[in-house]
Amino acid sequence: FKLSKEFDFVTWDNYIEFQWGKAKPETVSRDHALLRSYKKKPFWVMEQQSGPCGWSKLGPTPTPGKLRLWTYQSVANGADTVVYFRWRACPFGTEELWHGILNHDGKPNRRYAEVSRVGAEMEELSKNYRALMPRARVAIIKSFDSEWSQSIHRQVEGLYYDSLLLDYYRPFWNMGIPVDFVTAEEDLNRYDLVLAPMLMMVSDEGKKNIETYAQAGGKVLFSFRSGIKDMYNNMLTETVPGVFADLAGVEVEDCLLYTSDA
């Protein structure tokens, strides 16, 4: 979030089905939402998959309609620029199997026709709008400090911070409710609901900001393991939920760990 302030726009590479697996639709939308949330502005997709992709072996070939679907998904989530990668498959090198709109022969094909259709549709649509920016009334606090801490101390086998964020995002995605990702320090008053999954580490400014939001009538949902560490990644000696105990109005005396093999 802080780094994005130094740039005119942020971007990411969107590969949905390639050598290393397939991404679920909600995962792609979540990642789009995260990029949009960094600056609260439209973002770019610098590389949008346009063919079968892989290094040592080919990934799945996008079936008819998927390039169009993925492009519209990007735009609907706030992208104002989508760049297909690549134009034509390279005949040599590490990514010689990384197909683009055109195959190695450079001849127009099914994917070329599909991208041409999308281009014509976008040209027509652009007459009425520049970019779509979903107006989110729900926010999820994304804490890189908590994510990095949890990557070292897993807490529970099979628990991953990134997957947990997706679990909180998915129900809103299923209902068509836009979600922003925020820091604990930024303005929360525009949101009706703020979720704080596994917010283990929070700055004094962030803690105060969340308290102010809640005291003004905002709704905050904490998950397990929230408020348990300081900003130096040290465990606190206060009873769980630590720095949020007063705001939550509870103390956790004991807990049970549920794992996939329990």
Question: Which residue ranges define each predicted feature?
Answer:
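Carbohydrate-binding surfaces of carbohydrate-active enzymes
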Residues: 4-260
